[in-house]
């Protein structure tokens, strides 16, 4: 075999080895190129999946009394909530077991979200102060019943009743869930101070122990 043939055969072998090596590199590196993002969006809690609820006409839930300032009210039988008077204002009255414990000087009245900019905050009262936030109609308006499986939307707020002892309200990036045994608050990722805290994870159902942000 002459030198030219040897060089040609060696060149073909080198190209074949290079092709095999490139294919192996793609096979090894392929999964890394298609891997899922490290920070996937949190799942939407069932409390805020509106496809599970029947919307109601908000008209009968809005008080026309001047003293109620256009607010919308409802009761679940266990919880009393109100929407308004401005866009994305909502509050629910009551204290789940994980709310701040009452003391001789203060007790928890409920929680509220303000214009989707602050909250949920606990609304508390005490011997030396009273909150500016007021629960319930000032008139004789009787809040209608929002039933299990229904949703109510008014003034940029949507509330649902997943179960007889549970209520959930969302303004956008903020939300609250009340049950007798626990509460869960949601707020935007950028907000580190404008809200009250959630209970320790062990007090929440497993499906809600993760993120405090909504998708």
Predicted features along the sequence, with ranges:
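Extracellular glycan-recognition/adhesion modules and their associated mucin-like linkers
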Residues: 65-76, 148-154, 158
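Acidic, glycine-rich flexible loop segments
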Residues: 131-170
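A low-complexity, Ser/Thr/Gly/Pro-enriched, surface-exposed linker/loop concept
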Residues: 41-63, 88-146, 182-215
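Polybasic (Lys/Arg-rich)
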Residues: 179
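Secretory targeting and sorting signals
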Residues: 1-40
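Extracellular/lumenal glycan-associated surfaces
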Residues: 76-90, 154-174, 203, 211-215
